[in-house]
């Protein structure tokens, strides 16, 4: 039964099964809505002003993470 369900899940994925909008938004929040440090490439929260890493001297040289096409 588990194998049957996993196969069904895989088939839906391969056919381009839709992701529920709320789950998609949640995934985007955790993976895409980030700021990136230009010196050390650390992933930071979207409202970050300075980097949290010591190795780049807590620089304020940040950019938004590029969006997936």
Swiss-Prot record:
Query: Which positions hold the covalent cross-link Glycyl lysine isopeptide (Gly-Lys) (interchain with K-? in acceptor proteins)?
Result: 17
The positions making up the signal sequence are: none
Glycyl lysine isopeptide (Lys-Gly) (interchain with G-Cter in ubiquitin) cross-link: located at 4
- Tell me which residues bear N6,N6,N6-trimethyllysine: 39
Q: Which InterPro entries match?
A: Ribosomal_eL40_dom (IPR001975), Ribosomal_eL40_sf (IPR038587), Ribosomal_zn-bd (IPR011332)
Q: Where is this site: Essential for function?
A: 9
State the similarity comment. Answer: In the N-terminal section; belongs to the ubiquitin family.
Question: Any remaining note in the record?
Answer: Ubiquitin is encoded by 4 different genes. Uba52 and Rps27a genes code for a single copy of ubiquitin fused to the ribosomal proteins eL40 and eS31, respectively. UBB and UBC genes code for a polyubiquitin precursor with exact head to tail repeats, the number of repeats differ between species and strains.
What is this protein called in UniProt?
A: Ubiquitin-ribosomal protein eL40 fusion protein
What species is given as this protein's source?
Gallus gallus (Chicken)
